[in-house]
Amino acid sequence: MSKIKANSLTIEFDTFGEPEAKPLLLVMGLGGQMIAWDENFCQQLADAGHFVIRYDNRDVGLTTHFDDHGVPDFKELVVEFMTNGTVKVPYTLDDMAMDGISLLDELGIEQAHICGVSLGGMIVQAMAINHGDRILSMTSIMSTTGNPDLPPAHPKAIEALTSKRVDDPKHAMDRAVEVSKIIGSTGFERDEQRIRNKALESYNRAYNPDGVARQMAAVMAHGDRRPGLNQLKLPCLVIHGDIDPLVPVTGAHDTHQNVPGAELMIIEGMGHDMPKGAWSQIVKGIASLTNQTSATVPRDA
């Protein structure tokens, strides 16, 4: 793992595969550190012909935290939005999208394929909308468009993610297992020990719940991306589980309908996670998409 200065931040990142291969930038979801992209999954993508780049988003992991901005008061944000139609937040999804683009700049990569899950899917959508000339293809996994008319998350899923903060490693592991039972896949084997191990690794590496709150505020402030998605002219794959209780599958259908020419992959039995049993299908879908176009030669950093 390495650090690099980009977009006035210190960004922690990691790579898999050969630099000459197709560049593929992976963007994790709300509060998720880059290690949530399993190394074996990343290696499968590398073996499929990609130069895989995973990184910590701002405010999580080992990338710059925004602690001096405090913790958002979501009740105040709702009132502000209802009153003014906009909200003031520490940073926006557009800022988070620029982080990824700036990372590509510093790595000397002119164009890249991008793939994001959940919040990461929203971020890659913002990348494609704002920096279309830099994007070769977009894969949006278990994400949505910001359409306010779509069904909300299941109350139990929201409760699971907004429950009391963890205060020790054991609590972190136990909570991860409980959350997995509520929002995770039922059509695939659940590896409880793997969930515990990953939760412990994340807790010990960098536990920052205030950063998660600031990321959530960025989501609230971003609004509807459909007008921008309608203008995209790039290969796009939308992947979603049919039983996702946190971001309902209607978000996938809405994304598919609003990105011209997008492909849709609905995985039966998948919830709001990426179970190991679905990796091969996901990797195959991404590889098929990225084969539709090729990157320019990386420029000098």
What are these regions (language model features)?
Residues 232, 238-240:
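Short beta-strand/loop motif that positions the catalytic acidic residue
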Residues 153-227, 234, 254:
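Alpha/beta-hydrolase
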Residues 243-247:
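Acidic catalytic loop of the alpha/beta-hydrolase fold
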Residues 82, 87-90, 94-112:
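Conserved acidic catalytic loop of the alpha/beta-hydrolase fold
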Residues 121-132, 138:
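Short glycine-enriched nucleophile-adjacent loop
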